[in-house]
Amino acid sequence: MSTQTEQPMVSVEAICESPLGADLSESQCLLLAEASSIIGLDVGAPLLDEGHVDDRLYVVSSGSLEVFKPTGGGDTITLQLLHSGDMAGILGFVDGVPHSAAIRALTQCELIVLDRKDLEKLIEKDPQLVYQVMRTVVRAAHRILGKMNAQFVEMSNYISHQHGRY
């Protein structure tokens, strides 16, 4: 049986070593660690379900996860693999939109979890921290969009047989 376990406190080191801590001071990492939690996932455990809404950002601390969509008849297609340092739930965290795909653990995983309301509580205390975290989130979204654009161009070239590539 697949399970998900939550532990209340994230270490300062885990935040500092994650993408979230890349542009933060140690004291800012401490504030963010206090606002975050960590979860563990067993192999096969779901992290997110397609269509579900949640306001949390997930950062893979260890392990691998699969982002997938059902294709019908019980089959699925893998959209992306997530590894240490990758983020999940970005659009739900920023905008509260339903998840466009599902995510499940391929291996034992640990993930840092940051709830939007917990980050918002830090706006008055340390607005620079919130700004840097959101910059990191936008950078991650930008990388994903860049990959999707490249895949779209490759698929378009394949379909139209242009540029002599296929």
Stretches with model-predicted labels:
Residues M1-Y166:
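Cytosolic regulatory regions built on CNB/CRP/Popeye-like sensor folds
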